[in-house]
Amino acid sequence: MSAGLPIRTATVTRNTNETQIVCSISLDHTPGVDQQIIDIQTGIGFLNHMLHAMAKHGNMSLTLHCKGDLEIDDHHTAEDCALALGEAFKLALGERRGIRRYGTGFAPLDEALSRAVLDISSRPYFCGDLPFTREKIGDLSTEMIPHVFESFATAAGVTLHVDCIRGVNNHHIAEASFKALALAIREAITRTGGNDVPSTKGVLL
């Protein structure tokens, strides 16, 4: 964290008939200076693992607790957790001044290599190519993984591209993709030391 600058943090509560979620995020963890706190309890083990990896490698503190209707399936829980995370990210970031805005991350995991490109643009959009060959990884449907990215991008107000460049093992493809996103986030939210809005429009609403 830069000296004298406020910590970018937010807490979001999201309650519906399908899920009850509390999500707290801090974007400004500094290794060796303050304690990184990560506590993910979604009820979906593999989703916990992915969000933990994203927070860890994004240098974020993240607490996310969800009670969802998993007796139906994993859709509502995975989607709503991503929406809450995106909303908390947007609130923590605040006015989009003095940041790099753009971020790119490449992350390997053995044979898998994934790339994430992020624009904190207030233009919510997701595009991805994740060549999963299994229906599930653990207790998370693989079709929900791109939907998690899409839901996060929508709620956060960012443009996000996540692609697996190569990969065979489905677990590795997923984990490399979340880690690539973490690295892209780290770069995009880096403070520049200025106070300008990184846009020719002068605003990022």
Swiss-Prot record:
It holds the Pfam family IGPD. Keywords: Amino-acid biosynthesis, Histidine biosynthesis, Lyase. It comes from Phaffia rhodozyma. It is an enzyme of class 4 (lyase). It catalyses: D-erythro-1-(imidazol-4-yl)glycerol 3-phosphate = 3-(imidazol-4-yl)-2-oxopropyl phosphate + H2O. Its EC number is 4.2.1.19. This is Imidazoleglycerol-phosphate dehydratase. NCBIfam families: PRK00951.2-1, PRK00951.2-4. GO terms for molecular function: imidazoleglycerol-phosphate dehydratase activity. InterPro entries: IGPD_sf, ImidazoleglycerolP_deHydtase, ImidazoleglycerP_deHydtase_CS, Ribosomal_Su5_D2-typ_SF.
